[in-house]
């Protein structure tokens, strides 16, 4: 059975229990689909204070993570993952992660994630060892651990056998370049709000058409930029035009 090996270099490895002990990612670990190991740079320091950071050259606020503890942790991670493992640094300067990139990463056999802290890590480590830099958005976080967990969760969902239903990953938002359609469950009526009749009809062709139309409409209203980079089929153009017309008439 194929599996993905992910090695994480982090000053806070305990945070990754959220991945290994809960939800879909935990199930993937238990099934052997995902192998997750954390390496703490503090374990590779030689001074009694386990120093992993120092003041930046040129002055300025904050601290910068030192090269040597990171390199020594990376050596161990490479021994575990193999020399072919892609090294990724979670960084606000990186390319923004999207579903297309997640699909590519899910094809890898092994990934090493670097979760930085403080003002970042010494640029010489990045130049020497990092293959790719990825960001999860244009906002500031305290470290790379949460972005690393986001990446791990997103990639794990695409591993064969990780989800309970074979179609679940294919029907997620962004998988086909569109936002997801609305979903409903019991009861049929709640606070005078009814489930759309088409979903109760049992007509699978009509249900598919309604869901596609809702996905197109939501994307048009909330993330029109996604439609600009997507070529719509004739059916999709018709459904979107109907959605806009019905919305404007209501």
UniProtKB/Swiss-Prot annotation:
Presence of keyword Transcription regulation: no
Enzyme Commission number(s) from the entry: 2.1.1.228
Localization, UniProt: Cytoplasm
GO cellular component, one term: cytosol
One function term, GO molecular function aspect: tRNA (guanine(37)-N1)-methyltransferase activity
GO biological process, one term: tRNA N1-guanine methylation
Main location class: cytoplasm
Keywords: Cytoplasm, Methyltransferase, S-adenosyl-L-methionine, Transferase, tRNA processing
Keyword Acetylation appears in the UniProt entry: no
Protein name, as recorded: tRNA (guanine-N(1)-)-methyltransferase
Lineage of the organism: Bacteria, Pseudomonadati, Pseudomonadota, Gammaproteobacteria, Pseudomonadales
Gene for this chain: trmD
